Amino acid sequence: MRAVRTIDGEFGVVRVDLSDDNADGVVVDVVAAGICGSDLHMRTLGIQVTFGHEFSGRLGDGTAVAVQPLVHCGACDRCEAGQSHICRESGGTMYGIARDGGMADQVRVDPSCLVSLPDGLSVADACLVEPLAVAQHACNGVDVEAGQRVLVIGGGMIGLASVAVALAAGADVDLSARHRNQVEAGERLGAGTAASGEYDVVMEAAGTASAVAMAIDSVRPGGVVSIPALHWEGLAIPNGLQLTMKEVRLQYAFTYGHHHGEREVDQAAALLAVTPELAGAVVTHRFGLDDAPEAFRVAADRAGGAIKVVLEP
C-alpha cells in the first residue's frame, strides 16, 4: 500500500506493508489525514514510520471513525486518573510518530483509539477531531466559561480550534493572528480582533517567545495563560517580573485526556458535528496521497494562505 514517509530528509510516497505490530488492532481505511505543524518539524529527524496523527476513515464494515492516536497502558496512576495523555508507561507514544500513522491507504490501530462520529460529522472532516481535542483540553484545563474575555494568540489550526471551543463555552473571544487569511477564518468563526484592555484568559497557540510575552502583557492580574503550542526550541519565560507581580498562572497543555469522565476527543467530535463552519474556515487545501510532497510544501507556506492541509488517500 502507499504511505507517506521521509526519504533523505524529504517527504515522499513509498510502498509498504500494513503494520502487524498489534495483533488485536483494527484496520482503518483512511479517508482523510491532516498535516500538522509537528509533522513539518519532524521532517529532518529521520523517523522511519508512516506520518499522520490526525486522521479519519472507515472500518471494514463501513463504520466511519476518527482516531485518537495516543497510546497508553490504561493501568498506571495517570491513566486511572483520566490523564492517559501523560501515561507513565507510554510517555506520549503516538501513531504517526512512534508507530505507523494515517498518511497511508490503511492503518492498524488499537480499538481503544477509535472515536465514533456523531450525526452531522462527515468522515472527510473528522480528521479535525484530533487537533480540535488539543484545543478542547487546553480550554478545559483553564475552565474557560461564559462571560470571560478570552484572547487567542496564533491563527493556525490550534488557535482557530481554541476560538471555536471558547466561543462554544460562551466566552467573548478575540484573535490575534499574523496572516490576513487567519484573521478572516477567525471572523468566520465569530472571533473579534485583539483589542485594548485585559483578558481573563489568554491562549498562546503561536509557539513563539514573543507570543508568550504578549500573553503575559494582555492577561489581567490573577488571570491565566494557557500554552497549547509546542515550543520546539524550549522556552525562556519572558516578562518574568510582570508574571510574578500580576500573579499570572501559566498552564501548559499537552494533547488531550478525559474531562469530567468523558474523553476530550469525544467532546471534540460532538463540537465539530455542530460547528460545520470550523472545517470550512480552516481546511484550505485537499490533496490526493500521491501529491503528498506538494501538500507538505503548501502546508509549510503559511503566508501563502495554508491553514489546514488534508491528504485524501
Question: Where would I find each of the regions flagged by the language model?
Answer:
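Glycine-rich cofactor phosphate-binding loops and adjacent beta1-alpha1 units
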Residues: V142, E184-R249
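C-terminal substrate-binding/catalytic core of Rossmann-like NAD(P)-dependent dehydrogenases/reductases
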Residues: L235-T284, P293
